[in-house]
Structure formats: C-alpha cells, structure tokens
C-alpha cells in the first residue's frame, strides 16, 4: 500500500498547516520589558585560543576588533546612567586581553554591580594574567 503525500506550498493557505504568522497573531502574548538588569558587553575578538567552535571567530590575531579605550569610557557612562542594571557580563574573545578589562571591572564593581567574566580559563596561564583569579 503506497500513498503520496501532498506537496504543500507554504505561500498558499491549505487548511492543513496554519501559517506561522496567523498562529502567532492568534496566540501570541504581548511581551514587555520590565527593566534592564543585565548587560553583556563584548570587549573584542582577541583571544589566546583559536577554537573551531567559537561563535565570534576569535583568535590571537584579532586585534583590530578590540574595544577601544574611548568606547570603554563611553560604556561606563552609559552603564552609570542605567539605574536598573545589577549585572555586567563581559565576554569576547578573551575579554581579559582587552587593555580596558581591569579598569572596567574595577569601575563596575565600584558601583555595586555584579561582574561576570566569560573566561576560557587557559588565560590564567598567559603572561601578565597570573593574578587574574585573585583580581576577580
């Protein structure tokens, strides 16, 4: 016994499959933001690793994409103006390799914010990072 399944043209209403937009329009709830409590900040693509699974394509040669000190200063100003923030999530590459990393952490913690460092842990064995775990 063989049967042939119908070919459904997604652009035409068939009654078999409800179009996505119609379903969302019928069942969706309105989403609203209460307040911004967590902000993730990417400090650049510079990293001590070259992982094939890296979603930002970070690596040791990615210096051009590093956040500038001027941008870091502006980020601090914007964060200071947002009273609802409780957490700053620093990521990269290896955020610790950005020259502004420690001053950013110091600034945010000095303002009572929780700081998350998305660390690959191998950075702890890099020259100049020996005290990183104590700093954090």
Segments predicted by a language model, with ranges:
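Conserved alpha-helical substructure of the radical SAM core
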Residues: 2-119, 124-130, 134
């Amino acid at each position: 016994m063989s049967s042939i399944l119908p070919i459904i043209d997604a652009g035409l209403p068939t009654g078999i499959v409800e179009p996505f937009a119609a379903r969302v329009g019928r069942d969706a709830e309105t989403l609203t933001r209460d307040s911004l409590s967590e902000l993730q900040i990417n400090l650049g693509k510079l990293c001590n690793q070259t992982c094939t699974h890296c979603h930002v394509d970070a690596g040791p040669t990615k210096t051009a994409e590093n956040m500038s000190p001027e941008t870091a200063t502006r980020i601090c100003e914007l964060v200071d103006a947002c009273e609802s923030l409780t957490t700053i999530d620093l990521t990269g590459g290896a955020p610790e390799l950005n020259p502004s990393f420690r001053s950013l952490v110091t600034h945010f913690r000095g303002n009572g914010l929780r700081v998350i460092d998305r660390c690959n842990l191998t950075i702890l064995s890099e020259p100049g990072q020996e005290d990183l775990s104590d700093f954090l």
